[in-house]
């Protein structure tokens, strides 16, 4: 009996001891989980604009893939889940940070002007905006060669492995996602879709597909399988390219197999700008990094913080300075011409990062928003209202990071479909419509091989001293730069958590210098800005389509957030 009692006591003590060991080990092996707070990850994360694509990117990382591998896999997925935004018929810009070397590079695979194009193209701009449907607007797709170049330089897993999750998604009974159904049934888009070759993909008889309807897309599944097995060249110099060109020629396209074969992505150095304790790395023209850098460079001189904004009138004062800075920024968009086709632009765009220019702009900002004519800001008054695009942010276990923005331009691009390849074509040449130099009444014609200007700003901010990193970018056409700039301000200057920084309603300044407010934007701030002479746009856009995806690393903690405006959800571990 005594022996049995002693044995029981020993077993209890052994159990308690083992429990303590487990607790201690858990505390030693995973101290970060407790200190980082709920919702944080401790190793890596992916933020795409849908949960399923974020999960696919995370799975690639867990299979020991590189951040570039994860970004490619998530982008391939997004081309299926949100085909209105991006796909193989579009273009992509990567900003890539290598933690082992500390180097950042840009891979620009944005679409180019084909060798032959409609010579009267730019004369059509006023009549086709904002959508720009039709084969005459198609640029040479660069998406897939962009993936191939990024994978060649930074990939770790086999190429085919990056496509398998999305192929399985298509083969196993894919259904229409909610966000796609919203676009398909949009009152503006629906008539154009019905009249286009996309009708065969997105309509069931006379009705558009609804959320959770079966969505068979065998042509794209076949294309992805072929690309997975044979590589990107099958689209650029092989049979898929020939099929694509033949399909869209029937719809008026002038794109040729020679255009596809000639396309090459560019690998260039990023724009680099100090921002407090961070360094901002962003893509140079024709992408929009120079404009984003200009905005933040001007605003950082006003030293806005949570404390200054909390003072009476502080929030209105910050947004007033933001609005005035955005007016100047919109007036500088002409600097985003492609420097490869217009060499004189390169230095002009880099001037936007100069501190003396930022200081001069600050001195021109006073307490009123109605003291100056449009010419003071170089504003043209030409309204754009462009929208579209998708973004993925990735942080790997070693601290390497990728920000990748991809697009077919406006929703559903040119609304031109290749039924044999399953590819939707871009309408990227529409972006040439706002290539205007305020000092000249003449806009030079497009140059074959030229990349149109873009608002895409896949960016990485690095604070090496504190081990912090913000990987960020967005979608929403002309709203991208406004949304990304305000998210960075919210996070780094005002101390918002990442989800709140992204979710906060934004404002935007159009080319008339008028302010557009996202629904639910603070009414008191709106009133305060009006009292300062800021003019609210009378033609409010029907919907704000801005969507930011970001990953933030702070020491051992990793936070990731995808924009709920597009029903996004990040994933990590």
UniProtKB/Swiss-Prot annotation:
Disruption phenotype: Deficient mice shown no obvious phenotype but in most organs they have only 10% of the wild-type levels of gamma-glutamyl leukotrienase activity. Mice deficient in GGT5 have significantly more airway hyper-reactivity in a model of experimental asthma. Residues 1-8 are cytoplasmic. L-glutamate binds at residues 110, 407, 428, 454-455. Glycans are attached at residues 98, 185, 204, 277, 303, 347, 378. It catalyses: glutathione + H2O = L-cysteinylglycine + L-glutamate; an S-substituted glutathione + H2O = an S-substituted L-cysteinylglycine + L-glutamate; leukotriene C4 + H2O = leukotriene D4 + L-glutamate; S-[(2E,6E,10E)-geranylgeranyl]-L-glutathione + H2O = S-[(2E,6E,10E)-geranylgeranyl]-L-cysteinylglycine + L-glutamate. Inhibited by serine-borate. A previous study reported that GSH and oxidized glutathione (GSSG) are not substrates for murine GGT5. However, this result contrasts with two studies reported that GSH is indeed a substrate for GGT5. Belongs to the gamma-glutamyltransferase family. This is Glutathione hydrolase 5 proenzyme.
